[in-house]
């Protein structure tokens, strides 16, 4: 309780909230964008998080509807993404956007501080599905503890994925540029194709401090593969090429239709041989499928321990 009180005291945005709303607000800050925090006429706080879109309008619409249904009252927007409205119209409160860093672009409607003001930079890389524009997909919530700690949030968006080596090299080049600009720490995070390219950028010498790779894949679903050994061999090459230095978190779920099998064993063996000391989250109970890291349940359970390991090397349950 002392730690919670200290956290709340350090958060001006929650200073005027009641105890129930403060607790909801602390939860809200640790979930991914697009997200909205609202107050009902009853004084309670309500949240909606993890919505896709080029801007937060969809999250706002769905969040207000949900809030009004649950509170049975009119609801007021308090915070959109990380922008405290303080009575302003959300569009009028749109924060200025920082310039792109190579092929990295700022998360839309997100207040970033820039390399001199931020504690670091976390870069989200989305998955990919043929015919679907994933450039407006929501970052998974494990990015949020880093933004709470003062990191800026950028994205590595690819409408089409046709050049894997080129994408990995471009991401590595952008990390070098970010460090040259003054970002003290850079963390790469991604799911599926994004998880794969995050690891691949590391093998190309990207000066990263940490990598969070969830359900890494880029060969499609197993049912469509003619030879699963090719996909597994490429995975083995990736994990063998990672050198000690950055803190690595790899996550895999049961029932992943993109998983050829044995990949976490491959990762452990490769990292043991190279001296990398990772966190491997393999088949966590209660999570199933390629997209099990989406939504709010995974970051609520694992977000804090992933962040703690990347930042300090400490292993806290359930990451230990």
Question: Where are the language model's segments positioned?
Answer:
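Alpha/beta-hydrolase active-site loop
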Residues: 162-181
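Short, surface-exposed "cap/lid" segments of acyl-processing enzymes
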Residues: 105, 113-146
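Secreted/extracellular ectodomain signature
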Residues: 14-108, 120, 132, 142
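Conserved alpha/beta-hydrolase
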Residues: 145-162
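Primarily recognizes the serine-hydrolase "nucleophile elbow" in alpha/beta-hydrolase
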Residues: 185-239
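The feature captures the conserved acid-bearing segment of alpha/beta-hydrolase catalytic domains
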Residues: 216-280
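C-terminal catalytic histidine-bearing segment of alpha/beta-hydrolase fold enzymes
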Residues: 274-320
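N-terminal signal peptide c-region/cleavage motif recognized by signal peptidases
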Residues: 10-12
């Amino acid at each position: 309780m002392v730690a919670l009180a200290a956290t709340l005291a350090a958060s001006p945005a929650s200073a005027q909230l009641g105890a129930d709303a403060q607790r909801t607000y602390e939860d809200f800050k640790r979930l991914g964008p697009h997200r909205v925090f609202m107050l009902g006429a009853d004084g309670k706080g309500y949240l909606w998080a993890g919505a896709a879109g080029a801007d937060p309008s969809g999250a706002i619409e769905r969040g207000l509807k949900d809030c009004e249904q649950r509170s049975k009252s009119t609801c007021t927007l308090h915070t959109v993404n990380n922008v405290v409205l303080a009575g302003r119209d959300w569009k009028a409160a749109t924060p200025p956007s920082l310039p792109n860093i190579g092929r990295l672009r700022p998360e839309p409607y997100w207040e970033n501080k820039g390399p001199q003001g931020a504690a670091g930079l976390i870069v989200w890389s989305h998955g990919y599905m043929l015919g679907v524009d994933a450039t407006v997909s929501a970052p998974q919530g494990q990015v949020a503890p880093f933004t709470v700690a003062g990191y800026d949030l950028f994205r590595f968006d690819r409408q089409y994925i046709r050049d894997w080596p080129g994408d990995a090299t471009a991401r590595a080049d952008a990390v070098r540029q970010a460090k040259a600009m003054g970002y003290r720490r850079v963390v790469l995070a991604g799911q599926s194709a994004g998880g794969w390219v995050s690891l691949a950028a590391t093998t190309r010498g990207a000066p990263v401090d940490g990598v969070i790779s969830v359900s890494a894949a880029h060969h499609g679903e197993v049912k469509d593969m003619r030879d699963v050994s090719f996909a597994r061999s490429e995975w083995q090459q990736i994990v063998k090429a990672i050198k000690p230095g950055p803190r690595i978190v790899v996550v895999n779920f049961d029932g992943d239709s993109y998983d050829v099998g044995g990949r976490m064993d491959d990762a452990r063996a490769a990292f043991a041989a190279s001296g990398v000391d990772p966190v491997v989250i393999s088949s966590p109970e209660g999570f199933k499928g390629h997209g099990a890291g989406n939504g709010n349940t995974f970051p609520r359970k694992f977000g804090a321990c992933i962040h703690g390991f990347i930042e300090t090397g400490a292993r806290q349950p359930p990451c230990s």
